[in-house]
Each structure stands twice: as structure tokens, then as C-alpha cells.
Amino acid sequence: MNYDVIVVGGGHAGIEASLAAAKMGAKTLLITILAEQIGAASCNPAIGGLAKGHLVKEIDALGGQMGLTTDACGIQFRLLNESKGPAVRGSRAQIDMDRYRVYMRNLLLNTPNLEVTQEIATEILTKDNNIIGVKTHLDNNYGTKKLIITTGTFLNGLIHVGFNKLEAGRVGELSSKSLSASLKSLNLEMGRLKTGTCPRVLAKSIDFSVLERQDGDQDPTPFSFRTKEFNKTQLPCYIAYTNEKTHEIIRSNFDRAPLFTGQIEGIGPRYCPSIEDKINRFGDRERHHLFIEPQTREATEYYINGFSTSLPYDAQVEMLRSVKGFQNAKIVRHGYAIEYDYVSPTELKHTLETKKINGLYLAGQINGTTGYEEAAAQGLMAGINAALNLKTREPLILRRDESYIGVLIDDLVTKGTKEPYRMFTSRAEYRLLLREDNANLRLSKYGYNVGLLPKEAFEEMLKLKSNLEKGMEILLTKDMSPNKENLEFLASIDEDIINEKVPLQKIAARKSFTIEKLRKLNEFFLNLDDKSLNQILTEAKYYHYIAQQQIEVEKMKGLLDIKIPKSLEFKSISGLSNEVVEKLNKFAPPTLAAASNISGITPVAIDILHIAIKYHCQKTK
């Protein structure tokens, strides 16, 4: 049984990888431990958030699936940081996690070129450092040249609840020990990480009347640029707070906390600590927020976001019932911590193919990341690049200046990680260029070129791009003089008058200027759609900042164009420290730009390396 591409793992990374490969024409097999759990939301029932929403928009622009399914299964939509600048706003949706899972599974089962089998992958088969297949627990050998591993927390997974330990990849599902051993046998550098999840509580046991209600946006915007209609009927979330009694209960159980007893060895996520870790680290806090999120549209269970814990079950019940509104709470599913193996992402090329084994790709939590969106983004890129390689086409490597996906992968590959990595807007140097609202303008060309984005979606983007270019040309080339007619116009739209001739862009850049006012500024804008007008207005308001970032990008592109010859011996370059030589050898950056992103590689070292490359190229001509 031979396939062009085999994907191991049916989580968010595996879904995007298998769909991408199959849609690009590769005969694809998805191997998953439990077919019913394809697309399961193991942790919180939500997609997106700050920076994570950017990733979902970029996945969508490339032709991926996550945004479309979120729109189909969303039960609340919110734009976070709406009062701040467009670069740091983030879309977030609560999802019906049951419907999301069924939707994704049905989609995969009905996708041409894609087969699904419920088996456990146990061994990676190689020959002369090339992938030739994968073996399963049923002694089936599946042949392939491209193998994508997207195992999430299942690699040697170990669940902790108090002193109790359970080998599992998720509660109720087996872990994958043999596959972890197989990866280690390939001499890949591996480590151990930890994450956790929160209790789920029976809705009828919660007193919602004493909780703060949090509604979605009145006029929600879908995640996908391709979604034309979606269910705007939304469910509320709620906010609760821990208190000093809660904290006392947690402190009294520190001696039973796997996190503090040494039972857990893996490093947990810095920005999503367990509740016991919060109480330990922030002992002066009087309370901590808890976000009470419905798991489905029926809202029979609620996820207690912010209450991740691995304390014993009895302690979980006691501390939860100390929270106002939860005095009679009944836990349906307890919280737990889980440790799992991961591969150091410095073992990867920017294509997400391993450097040591040709045809072996890794995506998702196996690369040290945390989050559905980070996983899906990697899965999509691994699937695309595996399929492109089969066609002997150039790989798709997104730059840091054109996508958050590019930032994510570049950070992982060039810097590595010793703790679960999550995306933040602060990780992107050019975030004004990488807004949610222009993701399709930035990336649709790639999605269309590889064959994932439909033609109509690409043409819609081209129309938006044309409107933006024409609109900005008008704003930058046409002026407004302080004559009587113009002053009366400004007064009619409640705008301050001008005392000198100014470009229309300066008028549009005012904080008070809206798309309704823009429509009246020039006849070109009169009949434009809101999406185009919003895009034009954003570009106008941040024009000078955007222009400055584009200048910085052009400087960096100069470094991108300078490739580091594989034959260049770093240790022979005078002036490079032993640390720099060691890191250059370890990471093998393909370009000067990639080298400059490696932690510890100084600007001086880049200058020395640049000179050495010039000399090397002249000598080898």
C-alpha cells in the first residue's frame, strides 16, 4: 500500500497537512489513533485570539481550512483589542467543539485523494536517510516518500492528576511510545514539555446570575475571507474570580501538586500557567480572572478557562466550589497536566522537513509549539511543501516580513525552544505590515499558485487590491485647499477645518475620519464596499509608519538575497567566535538574513560572514 504523502495524527496540524497534500493532487493517507476524535479541541473551545487570529487569517489566505470551519461552528465572535491599533487586534471565536470535530472529520472523509485509517503508527521506515514508509500496530507497512508527523501531545504522553499518572495522549486515548522511540533512533534531538487543561463543569450546577456576562460583537465578522454567510446567533461567556479562600485551598495542596513535587519533568507554557503555578508565582494577587466558556451551542458544559490544574480531583472540587457562582459546581471532566516528547525544531529546515531524514516533516506540538492555530499553520506549510517537493517545485517559505507564519517557523528553526512556544504580535518586527485585515492581500497569491485557494477567492483579492491601490493613489496625489467649498464640506462632516493645502491622505489619516466620511471625500469611494474602504482608511492612517517599515524590509531583503554557500567552512573565518561558529554549524542558515535571526549571532558577526561569503564566491569562480 503506497501513498505520495502520509500524515500521522488527526489534530489541527494533521488536518491542514492532509487536506493541503490531497488538494494539491497527492495520494494521501491520514493515520490517526481514534477517527472519532479528528479535529478535537483538547483544551479550550475557542479559535483565534491575539496574534493567533492573525495565523488563522493567514491559513485562510493560503487556502487552509481552519477559518472556514470556525465560521461554520462558531457560537461567539469577538474582536480583541478593538480600541487599539489594527496591527494588534485579534479575532477570536468560541466554537461548538462537538460540531467542529464532526465537521472536520466529515470533510476529510469526503476529500478526493485522501484516505483515513484508524491505526497507531509505531515505526518510521527509512533507507539511506530517506523516508520509505511507516509501520502501524497492525503490522501494516505503508510506503511513502513524504511522511508528516503531527502527533500533538501523544508522543510518550503521560497524564498527571495529583499522584496519579496515566499513559495517554489525551484522556481516554492511548499514547504513542513506539513512535517516540522510532524518532529517537533517527538521532533527532528531543526533549520533554508539559501542558495542561481545565475542568469542565455541568452548566446547571453554575449560578450564572452572580457572574459577569461577556457577549460577543453585535455585528460579528467571520474568520474566513471566503465566508459569505454564517450563523450570527451567539452565546454569552461569563467571568468569575478566584478569591483568598480559593488561594488558601490551592496552597494547602501544594504538597500534592505534581508541578511542585518533582513528578512533572517537562517544562510548561510560560504564558498559560496552571492555577497552582499562578498562586505560587503571584502570591500578592487578591484574585485571578476565570473565563466561563460554553463548549457547545447546547451549553450543557462549560470550560473554566484560567483554571488549568493537575491537583487531585478532590482538591479541584474544593477549590472550584470556593469561587462565587460555583458553590454547587459538578465537574464533568477534571483538569490534568500532560507531559509529552517533542523534537527540537532546530532539526528542521524552513520547509519543516528534517535536516537528517529526507522526506520526514514535523508539524505542530511535536516542534515545541502550543496552540491550535500554531499547529494548523505548521501543518498547512508541511503539507504544501511535501506536495511541492513531489512535483519538484520550489518550496514555499514565507518571510518574516510577509506573514506571522513566517515569523513562527523562522523563530522555531533558527532559535529553537525549550518551552512551549506561542505566537504574540510582539514577535513580529513588521507587525504594521502583517495585520489581520490584509492577510489575503499578502498571501492569497501563494495559496492560488500552489492550487489551494479557489480562483474566485483569488480574483476577489485582486479586486480588493485594485481598489486599495486606486484609493491610495487618489489620497496621495489629490489635495484639498482651504477654499470656501472645502471648508463647508469639512464642517458638514464634523471635521476640523484646514489652513493650508494638504493631501487628502492627511485628512483621511485623522483619528475621527470614518469610512462614511471617506465615501464623501471623492466620487471613487462612493460605491466601494466596506471591506475596501476599511482597507484604504487603515493604509491612509498609518501610511508613514507603513512606509518606514517597508524601507526596513527592503534592507532585510538585501540580506535574504545573500545565500551562504554550503561549502563555506565557518571555522576557517577569522574573527568569528567559537560560539558563533558553533551556532552556524548547528543551524546551517541558508542566507545571511536567517543567520542574523539566530540568537547570539551579532551584527559584527554578520558583517564578517558577509565579507567571507564574497571572498569565498570569488575564490570558487
From Swiss-Prot:
Q: One GO biological process from the UniProt record? A: tRNA wobble uridine modification
Residues bound to NAD(+) are 268-282
Coiled-coil spans in chain: none
Q: What PROSITE patterns is this protein classified in? A: GIDA_1, GIDA_2
Tell me where it resides.
Answer: Cytoplasm
By its UniProt entry, which SMART domains does this protein fall under?
GIDA_assoc_3 (SM01228)
Return any one Pfam family short name. SAM_GIDA_C
Residues that bind FAD, according to the entry? 9-14
**Keywords, comma-separated and alphabetical:** Cytoplasm, FAD, Flavoprotein, NAD, tRNA processing
Q: Subunit structure, briefly?
A: Homodimer. Heterotetramer of two MnmE and two MnmG subunits.
Biological function:
NAD-binding protein involved in the addition of a carboxymethylaminomethyl (cmnm) group at the wobble position (U34) of certain tRNAs, forming tRNA-cmnm(5)s(2)U34.
**What family does this belong to?**
Belongs to the MnmG family.
Could you tell me which HAMAP family the record lists for this protein? MnmG_GidA (MF_00129)
Entry protein name: tRNA uridine 5-carboxymethylaminomethyl modification enzyme MnmG
Q: Which organism is it from?
A: Campylobacter fetus subsp. fetus (strain 82-40)
Q: What is the lineage of its organism?
A: Bacteria, Pseudomonadati, Campylobacterota, Epsilonproteobacteria, Campylobacterales
